[in-house]
């Protein structure tokens, strides 16, 4: 290992908080709020890669986290459309070299961006990337959180939300939670709505293509593309705590200073565009494509609910 690259990172962090109280129905009502926001971008400013080949990890001007991939213009509606496509794009072997019978109805329709009649990676450099382009970035465009709470008449409530702005993730071929039988023919996990989500002549507007085993581990789905690149931004209801402290006069006769009954919930709900395409991958556990081990079958954040009582003597 060597320190062979120069990196420039620019970003910001913001934090705002407010706490106050006023009288409500003759009793003090206290409330508080806190919000945080941060963002950063990192670029390579110096690296020994004069041709800017993708064969090396970095190149000058590279933004860390950029995702290069192919553009997909939907699925072929008929075998005839697929045949017409292959008469215009003559060499599709980089994409469909392992597909028996070539492109058929229900397969992905890749766009020949450079118009040379060949679907591929060109010279595999930034200047000649073939039919690839930057589709997104794997690092969050921003990270934020906010807390809201109040206390009144012995009740106290606090809620914490946490989330990120847009960032993107392409599922690894071994991620059966996302791909199901597109990973392996002997897959042990099949989504309950799989039949409704995959292409067939009766379901031409499906999100997933015609079923082909191993297409995510070596076929057309293994090529990073715009159709299955996932925006994994999210907003998570991270914590809710509701408590009630018994009035002191109730406790005087039993020699107890304080009794508080409470409920705490963790990871109660989340909002994310990923839910539209897959209910079985948690956006917070969707790592970058290079983290193969974490990409395969990551556990989701568990929802927990707990009731308790605090007694102070």
Where are the predicted features?
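Transmembrane beta-strands of outer-membrane beta-barrel pores
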Residues: 20, 37-43, 152-154, 163-167, ...
